[in-house]
Amino acid sequence: ALPPPQNRWDRGRRGPEELSRPRFREVLEHQRKLRREDRFYSLAVFERTSGALVGGASLMDVMRGLAQAAFLGWFVHSPFWRRGYGKEAVRALIDIGFRDVGLHRLEAGIEPENRRSILLARSLGLRKEGLKRRAVFLRDTWVDLGVYAVTCEDVGIPWKGMAKPSPR
């Protein structure tokens, strides 16, 4: 079981309804559907020894056409903080986003006070591009987000060119 939230970004304990096998299967099937539609790609991170869910990373709202971009997000449960899991997952997802999904740009929105996520983003080559004021509704209020982004060229991966529509 997870401990109570450690700060405002920590999701803390989950209710039994969120942890059931049927609910987990439902989430996985929904994610498979979004992946088939080229809209969402995710990685789950598990501890090697215990098999415990450590966290995850996602490419969300994939944009094709002129943008060839996606939003990048991640989370790590508090018992696993400061062990490198987040960095390993986000690094892998950046590589997948550029090499396998064929994206050109990835963007993360990070709350300005979330120093650990900012350090993680910068350590992987994301640069700060600005601030979106009152960008998302979290914890019952509108929250500002720092905009951090990386392109495939920034990390030395050649862009594959415009994605061709997949047959449906």
Model region roles, listed by residue range:
Residues 112:
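Catalytic-loop Lys-Pro-X-Asn motif of eukaryotic-like protein kinases
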Residues 57, 72, 106-108, 122, ...:
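A structural signal for short, well-ordered beta-strand segments
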